[in-house]
Swiss-Prot record:
Pfam families hit by this protein: PAPS_reduct
UniProtKB keywords: Oxidoreductase
Membrane-spanning parts: none
Natural source organism: Escherichia phage 186
Keyword Nucleus assigned: no
Gene3D superfamilies: HUPs (3.40.50.620)
Protein encoded by which gene: CP84
Protein name per UniProt: Uncharacterized 37.8 kDa protein in gpa 5'region
Length: 334
């Protein structure tokens, strides 16, 4: 049952989709119930190509999707100015570099730090680092703010009520279990509300709804992925990272190249996709000794492919048939 407020006069529902199972379930619900809506996808530039192809498939089945992308051109220009003006002093006084070393680092940063048009890469180069568990700025900058600025704010000027649909479920985490199904005047914004229609659904429920409508799951779910947004996500499980190394080494190579670019835009020149403590056996907290070569994403292959705390190579994983479905969710391979 859809909340009746979603059908009120001068109301528009904004259904955010990602190519994942949960956003698909709420999208199907909106279509089933003929909810007045705008469907939107925030392109982060860090999705797998199969997810982008899957989004095209969903659009052919469920209707049009507005695609939005964050733009960091102005902020990158601001950082270039900051580097030119502030780094000559801070690199020497705070990072212990000589004036010659500082000049070399600054020249390299200014050579690299230019907009690429890829939101995720541009964000990380502007920040001089990758997102982390404690600094998860990716979702805010690439999804929340982009949808707010390009979809929500214009909608608030046109409609009395704007309802943001969020495909989150209580089963996912204690934090999400504590969320309400409806939030009035979200972000202290009159007329802006958040609705979570599948909050109490299970994994099985969301897959069953799609199956009932004859809609295929994102193929990444059948290839060992528990998440199908960013490839890889900073929260990727060890087993999931192993699948990525085995199935899509080109994605690892792409991120490794991004590490080189982002590191060049950081003061110490050593920004890595995963923190240097990711592998417990060689965890390093001394930031001054961390290098991209030693702790970049490519260095985690052996760790990802091992069991027993990283001490035993997983021969079964190495020889698995990658054409066979290996979903972590029950029922997906049926």
């Amino acid at each position: 049952m859809i909340d009746s407020r979603c059908f009120a006069e001068s109301t528009i529902n904004i259904v955010s989709v990602s190519g994942g199972k949960d956003s698909l379930a709420q999208w199907i619900l909106a279509v089933e119930n003929d909810v007045p809506r705008t469907t939107v996808f925030a392109d982060t530039g860090h999705e797998h190509s199969q997810t982008m192809e899957y989004l095209d498939y969903l659009e052919s089945r469920l209707g049009p999707v507005i695609r939005v992308k964050a733009d960091f051109t102005r902020r990158i220009e601001g950082k270039r100015k900051f580097i030119a003006e502030k780094w000559p002093v801070s690199l020497v006084e705070e990072c212990g570099m000589s004036h010659e070393q500082a000049a070399e680092r600054i020249a390299k940063a200014l050579e690299i730090l230019k907009p690429t048009g890829n939101p995720f890469l541009d964000l990380c180069m502007w920040k001089g680092r990758f997102p982390s568990t404690k600094a998860r700025f990716c979702s805010l900058e690439l999804k929340h703010d982009s949808v707010r600025d390009k979809i929500v704010l214009p909608a608030l000027e046109k409609y009395d009520e704007v309802i943001l649909w969020q495909g989150v479920r209580a089963q996912e985490s204690p934090a999400r279990a504590a969320l309400p199904m409806w939030e009035e005047d979200a972000d202290n914004t009159p007329g802006l509300h958040v609705y979570r229609p599948i909050l109490n659904w299970t994994h099985e429920d969301v897959f069953a709804l799609a199956k009932r409508h004859g809609i295929k799951p994102n193929p990444l779910y059948q290839q060992g992925c528990s998440r199908v947004g960013c490839m890889p996500c900073i929260h990727a499980r060890k087993s999931e990272l192993a699948e990525i190394f085995a199935r899509w080494p080109e994605e690892i190579a792409r991120v490794a190249e991004w590490e080189r670019l982002v590191a060049a835009c950081s003061r110490r020149g050593n920004s890595t996709f995963f923190p240097s403590t990711h592998d417990p056996r060689r965890a390093e907290k001394r930031i001054e000794v961390v290098t991209v070569e030693e702790y970049g994403i490519a260095s985690y292959r052996d760790w990802a492919m091992t069991t027993r705390g990283g001490s035993q190579y997983d021969l079964l994983a190495a020889t698995n048939d990658k054409t066979v479905c290996s979903s972590v969710y029950a029922g997906v391979c049926e």
